[in-house]
A protein has these predicted regions:
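Metal-dependent enolase-superfamily TIM-barrel catalytic cores that perform enediolate-based chemistry
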Residues: 1-59
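Short acidic catalytic loops
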Residues: 13-16, 86-91, 172
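Hydrophobic/aromatic residues in well-formed alpha-helices
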Residues: 26, 76, 176-177
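Shared catalytic-loop signature of beta/alpha-barrel
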Residues: 31, 37, 46-159, 163
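C-terminal extensions of enzymes
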Residues: 149-184
Length: 184
């Protein structure tokens, strides 16, 4: 209630269980949130539980969003074709690139499902996808990593400004590579 009152009616509220809840906990929590116009519950169950997500989708009114932990078009197809997801969230950096992520967007579009790419650490990559694919409805913004980029993403009146540089549209700062990088 406090969040809805603070944000007002014009701002969407999304919840994220990060795959940590079981079906009863989702039902209980979402029943408490039903009066606050929650857009979705993200990753309500463990990320590879297709049957559980389908069962939960039949029980709850809140749409399910997921995809950041899925690593192939085939896995997305399982969730989409079985009805276990209503907002599709591919992450190009985890799917192995933009091509596979766009294939997921195509699949979602065929099933009339909106796409909201998972921003993760490289939201710039997802922005480029939004330029070319009609299924992308929303983009996430991760403000706590903007200091890591020479040309961080900019938002103007609630909309991203598209990067003008080639590739991912930015350059990662060396100090962040040293801070967050790891040897492999």
């Amino acid at each position: 209630e406090a969040v809805r009152n603070a944000l007002g009616e014009d701002v969407r509220i999304m919840t994220d269980a990060n795959g940590r809840w079981r079906i009863p906990q989702n039902i209980e929590t979402l029943s408490c949130l039903k009066d606050y116009d929650v857009t979705w519950i993200e990753e309500p169950l463990w990320h590879d539980d297709v049957a559980g997500h389908c069962r939960l989708a039949e029980i709850i009114e809140t749409p399910i969003a997921l995809g950041e932990m899925l690593y192939s078009l085939a896995h997305f197809n399982e969730f989409i074709s079985s009805g276990g997801v209503k907002y599709v969230q591919p992450d190009a950096t985890r799917l192995g690139g933009i091509t596979e992520a766009l294939d997921v967007c195509d699949l979602a579009y065929e099933h009339e499902l909106p796409v909201t790419p998972h921003a993760g650490d490289m939201a710039q990559t997802q922005i480029h996808m939004s330029i070319v694919h009609q299924s992308i409805e929303l983009l996430e913004f991760i403000p706590w990593i903007t200091h890591c980029f020479e040309e961080p993403l900019k938002i103007n009146s609630g909309y991203f400004e598209y990067p003008q540089m080639p590739g991912a549209g930015t350059t990662i700062k060396n100090e962040c590579m040293q801070e967050f990088g790891r040897k492999v």
